[in-house]
Amino acid sequence: MAVETVVATPEDNDPWINAQRQFDAAADVLHLEPGIRAILREPQRELSVNFPVRMDDGSVEVFRGYRVQHNVNRGPAKGGIRFHPQVTLNEVRALSMWMTWKCAVAGIPFGGAKGGVIVDPGRLSHDELERLTRRYATEISLLIGADRDIPAPDVNTTPEVMAWIMDTVSMSEGYSIPAVVTGKPLSVGGSEGRNAATGRGCAMVAHQVCARLGLDPRRLTAAVQGFGNVGSIAARLMARDGFSIRAVSDAYGGIHSEVALDIPAVVEHTRRTGSVVGFPGARPVTNAELLELPVDVLVPAALENQITAANAGRVQATLVLEGANGPTTPDAEEILVRRGVTVVPDIVTNAGGVIVSYFEWVQDLQSFFWSEREINERLGRILTRAFDASWEASERLGVSLRLGAYAVAVQRVAEATSDRGIFP
């Protein structure tokens, strides 16, 4: 495979510009009516908040957070909350738009939203993290609600964080509202299968695309960037299903082996040490190096903007499964597609999380819960429909798999927008 070298521009790494470029490409293919196009190209609501938190030493620090609702024409807004020092408004805007398309291509009745706080949670004590979470939840309570906007876990947020948000909103209203967030512990209305849903969905999509391409997973090597909730579960399930996982990484670095890694052992090593780094029998690699390893399948499952125009020409994998949101920039994807690389987009690959969040929301509203087996069966059916619709649109329109998925999603949201009309 030929190597291309391109210098990335600043715009190439702005997630909001990239999200709008992806939307514009789909709007062009669909010949979207100008008014609908203008509506869908921008977020519907944006809330920026600056809020104080009392620290353990008695001092007060002020944090900035966001909640953005991109579109609610197909139902309540849905999207995670991330705690990260590099959160920006443009990032949250992009993530909210991607959630709109993700829910639409999956055929679940939600619009898209996202939230974030600019903070390094690793430097907070447990009590400080709880106080920050509860104050942020109070600040965005103007927007969130079980029938308005339902948050969920994302980067550096956990089921415990979701329980704090649920409790904060419930205390404000005077009664328990479990459906206000998803991704909660089972004890307070969480769903079986939710914690593993995104990684499980990624592994399911890996099998679906292999079937379409006539590939045998048992003959394929893979590398997974990001060994958190999504990447570790995807790696474990893909290894179980026959893929030879040769490399994994986390925020501290990565490991690579010439033979298949023992993923359960890597998980245990990470539990004990806090990182995959130093796993016995594997050589160290950086996150950047992992993306360019000689493997068949690459699963970027960390943060956005990992595969850019600057390194896309050196990616050796022939199949990219986007476990993270926005890991491949539009310019990078053009290079990959030109080189014959199949890219399965994030709005399909990592949709398992929001699909099972939908199940959790439905179960909370009905106070009737399903078994993990029932959850996983329903997840498989919905993901298969979403993948098949995207693949068939790609072939029908003669476009990339991402553009096929976007065409399906944007068309569904455009139809809902048109059918509802313009108020007043």
Name these PLM-found stretches:
Residues 84, 104-218:
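Glycine/serine-rich phosphate-binding loop and adjoining beta1-alpha1 elements at the start
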Residues 49-121:
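Glycine-rich, N-terminal phosphate-binding loop and its surrounding beta-alpha-beta segment
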Residues 6-50:
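Short, Gly/Pro- and small/polar-rich lid/capping loops
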Residues 185, 190-292:
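Glycine-rich phosphate/diphosphate-binding loop of Rossmann-like nucleotide-binding domains
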Residues 253-343, 348:
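Rossmann-like adenosine-cofactor binding region
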Residues 33-39, 107, 144-153, 175-179, ...:
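Flexible, glycine/charged-enriched surface loops at secondary-structure junctions
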Residues 7-14, 209-210, 314-424:
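Adenosine-phosphate binding glycine-rich loop
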